[in-house]
Structure formats: C-alpha cells, structure tokens
C-alpha cells in the first residue's frame, strides 16, 4: 500500500489508520481467537451435557435455542472476524480495507440478529420456570410443547424487529468492520439494546425471587416423591438463573460501554482514530461473552449435577433418620400401641 495520499477518499485513509492502530489490530486478533475458542465449550455443552440432561423437555428446548443461537453467532462472526483480520494482509490499496456496502449491510444485519436472539431467551426461560414451579408436583408428566413454541416465536419476533429497524438503513459506503452499526439506524438499534437490557435486568430479579420460592417449596414438602420432583425443578431453575446472570452481566456491560463510547467518547478521546480503536476493542466483548457463557455453563451444569446427587442421597437418608424418620418412627409405635390395645380389649 504505497499509494499517494492524493485523491484518496477520507474513508479509505481512516480505514487504513484504524486497521493498523495497535489497539484495534490486537483486539481484532483477540476476537478471532475467542470466537474460535468458544466453539468448543458451546458444542460440548449442547451435545454432551444439555441434550443428555434430565431437564424437562420444555426447558431443554429453550436452552438449546439459547445456546444454539450463540453457537451460530460464533460461527458467523468467526467468518466475519477472519475477513477483518485478513484484509490488511491482502489489500493492495487503502480503499481495499473497506468492506463493500452490500456485504457490510448483510454481515451487520446477521450480527445484530444473532446477537439479540439470545437476549429474548432468558425471559422465556423464566416464564417456563414459573410454570414449572406452579406445577412442580406433576410437571415432569407435562408434555413438551411450551418450550418449542416459545423458541420458534422468539426467533420470529426478533427477526421481525431487526428487519423493522433495518428497513430504514442507508448504507452508501463500506465499513472497516461488520460490528459498526450504520449511522442511519444506530439510535434505533441502541434503543432496542437498552430495552432488552432493562427487560433482562427485571427478568433476572424476578428469577431470583422465583428461585427463593422454589427453595421454600422444597423445604415445605416431606414426602420422598415430592422432594424428588421439587429438587429437579430447583436444580434446573438454579442452573438457568446462573446462565441468566452471566448473560445479563456481559450484555449489560457491552451495551452500556458501546453506547457511552459512541455518544460521549469524543469527550475522552480527541483523536477520532483513537476513539474508533477503543470502540472496536470494546465491541470484542461479545466474543468474550460467547466463550465465557460456554465455559460457565459446562461448569455450572457439573456443579449442580453433583449437588443434586448429594441432595437426593441426603433426602433418602433423612426419610429414615431425620425429622421424617422420627415421624415415621412415632407412627409405627402408635400403630403397634393401637394394635396391642385392640387385642387386650378383645380378650376381656
């Protein structure tokens, strides 16, 4: 790229300076590595833990939709990140660093769609867990219907909303990155992000209350069958809330930092190239989230499965030795006493 700067569009010069900015460049490589690394825990969790888990089919359908969307997002963004890292090596001119408008618009549309689909699933998971709590005694017998219907509905709803926003998108030039949202729809897209963040925050608070209710129900039932049913609901609810917590933390941080940098970043960075580099660096947080949620889910599932086994074994022992065992012992003595009294009365 030894071309003269004369008659070169400003966008091409900006793309060149940003592409070789050390902060931007290093974080683009970091994003590529994290997206590639996220494929392994996500695939392992879905195939070898989630599909083989004892979760009810409704919850399992929603979790498959949630983690499946994240996995597809990682694959699509991995391709896009590879293109962004590759362009500086193969470009002969500064303008070659810009992604062509039609590819940029398609890539950004797919990115926003796949990034926002998982934000709907925590809300549906909490709703499904609420139904499971209310029907805890016989929920395991409920047929699998609610989960798949909710999963399909959420994907279609998000697709409709994203297309509604992108209907007004005006893309006349290329972009150095697929993740930079077109200026013509940036405000609406960020409002959508804020709305989903608020909903997810309220949802997490409600999920926490739901978990406490599950714990109370589990303690209030003394029969072995009821304990087994409630333990299953409690464990799966606790796992879901742990995943929701990771989701809200990363998505909330990403949304907050991205919006602050876009609208207030110029107060901290006078050089637009430095600001663009920092914005691009923080946008790689989503790849970190994809990796973190995969690893965290494998870990959470392992921990709660072990705790569930210990809890069930403890319940079985309690029936014989604990408070329930004492009640059973008193009942047995009372029955023996009644039978003895009845025999004595008959003999007189």
Curated annotation (Swiss-Prot):
GO terms for molecular function: transmembrane signaling receptor activity. It is a multi-pass membrane protein. GO terms for biological process: sensory perception of chemical stimulus. The chain crosses the membrane at residues 31-51, 63-83, 107-127, 145-165, 191-211, 241-261, 280-300. It comes from the Eukaryota. Keywords: Membrane, Transmembrane, Transmembrane helix. This is Serpentine receptor class beta-7. InterPro entries: 7TM_GPCR_serpentine_rcpt_Srb. GO terms for cellular component: membrane. It is found in: Membrane. The keyword Transmembrane helix applies. Belongs to the nematode receptor-like protein srb family.
């Amino acid at each position: 790229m030894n071309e003269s700067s004369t008659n070169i569009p400003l966008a091409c010069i900006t793309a060149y300076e940003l592409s070789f900015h050390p902060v931007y460049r290093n974080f683009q490589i970091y994003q590529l590595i994290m997206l590639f690394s996220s494929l392994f825990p996500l695939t392992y969790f879905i195939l070898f833990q989630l599909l083989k888990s004892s979760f009810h089919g409704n919850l399992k359908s929603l979790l498959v939709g949630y983690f499946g969307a994240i996995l597809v997002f990682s694959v699509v963004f991995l391709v896009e990140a590879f293109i962004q890292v590759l362009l500086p090596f193969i470009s002969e001119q500064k303008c070659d660093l810009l992604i062509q408008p039609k590819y940029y618009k398609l890539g950004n549309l797919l990115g926003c769609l796949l990034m926002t689909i998982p934000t709907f699933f925590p809300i549906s998971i909490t709703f499904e867990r609420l139904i499971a709590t209310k029907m805890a005694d016989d929920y395991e017998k409920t047929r699998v219907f609610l989960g798949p219907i909710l999963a399909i509905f959420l994907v279609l709803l998000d697709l409709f909303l994203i297309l509604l926003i992108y209907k007004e998108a005006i893309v006349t030039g290329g972009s150095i990155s697929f993740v930079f949202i077109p200026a013509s729809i940036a405000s609406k897209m960020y409002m959508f992000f804020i709305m989903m963040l608020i909903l997810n925050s309220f949802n997490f608070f409600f999920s926490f209350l739901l978990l406490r209710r599950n714990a109370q129900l589990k303690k209030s039932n003394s029969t072995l069958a009821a304990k087994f049913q409630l333990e299953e609901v409690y464990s799966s609810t606790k796992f879901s809330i742990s995943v929701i917590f990771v989701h809200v933390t990363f998505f909330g941080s990403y949304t907050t930092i991205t919006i602050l940098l876009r609208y207030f970043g110029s107060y901290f960075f006078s050089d637009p190239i430095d600001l663009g580099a920092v914005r691009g660096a923080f946008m790689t947080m989503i790849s970190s989230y994809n990796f973190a949620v995969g690893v965290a889910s494998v870990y959470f599932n392992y921990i709660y499965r072990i705790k569930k086994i210990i809890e069930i074994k403890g319940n079985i022992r309690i029936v014989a030795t604990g408070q329930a065992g004492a009640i059973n012992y008193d009942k047995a003595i009372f029955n023996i006493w009644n039978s003895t009294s009845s025999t004595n009365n008959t003999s007189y």
